[in-house]
UniProtKB/Swiss-Prot annotation:
Subunit structure comment from the entry: Part of the 50S ribosomal subunit.
Species: Geobacter metallireducens (strain ATCC 53774 / DSM 7210 / GS-15)
GO MF, one annotated term: structural constituent of ribosome
PANTHER family cross-referenced by the UniProt entry: LARGE RIBOSOMAL SUBUNIT PROTEIN UL13M (PTHR11545:SF2), RIBOSOMAL PROTEIN L13 (PTHR11545)
Keywords: Ribonucleoprotein, Ribosomal protein
The protein's name in its UniProt record: Large ribosomal subunit protein uL13
Nucleus found in the keyword field: no
Keyword presence, Ribonucleoprotein: yes
A biological process from GO: negative regulation of translation
Domain of life: Bacteria
Function field: This protein is one of the early assembly proteins of the 50S ribosomal subunit, although it is not seen to bind rRNA by itself. It is important during the early stages of 50S assembly.
Gene3D superfamilies, per the entry: Ribosomal protein L13
Matching InterPro entries: Ribosomal_uL13, Ribosomal_uL13_bac-type, Ribosomal_uL13_sf
Length: 143
């Protein structure tokens, strides 16, 4: 009888990857990042265990959106009070906090469970080309 090997949290080895977001399309880049954070590219992948790697994204301010999404795509938040809804266009969000645009796109592509919070903590996004993770020697990932 053959059995499937289930990954254990202690056995998982985590690598660091560096992604340059310069002139990359947001959605296509976010799907690749989400798959790496989940560990779907690894042979030891188990849905109930966080087997993913760390991802460092640089140049978030140079991300591209296709079509007219810079003006049309809206992000909403609500305070919980009546009339407390706020909206911001994707173009304004890139100007204010470009890191949030990538983080929100990747978060929407992760599973909606407790593991998603742990997976999202492994995503490090920086607006410019500099990042403080040189000591981890991240491998450059072409998307």
């Amino acid at each position: 009888m053959k059995t499937t090997k289930v990954a254990k949290k202690e056995e998982v080895t985590r690598d660091w990857f560096l992604v340059d977001a310069d002139n990359k399309v947001l959605g296509r880049m976010a799907t690749e990042i989400a798959n790496i954070l989940r560990g779907k590219k690894k042979p030891i992948y188990t849905p109930s265990v966080d087997t993913g790697d760390f991802v460092v994204v640089v140049n978030a301010e140079k991300i591209q959106l296709t079509g007219n999404k810079l003006a049309d795509k809206m992000y909403y938040s609500h305070s919980g009070f009546p009339g407390g809804i706020k909206s911001i266009a994707a173009g304004k969000l890139i100007e204010k906090k470009p890191e949030d645009l990538i983080r929100k796109a990747v978060k929407g592509m992760l599973p909606k469970n407790k593991l998603a919070r742990h997976m999202l903590k492994k995503l490090k996004v920086y607006a410019g080309p500099a990042h403080p993770h040189e000591a981890q020697q991240p491998k450059t990932l072409e998307i």
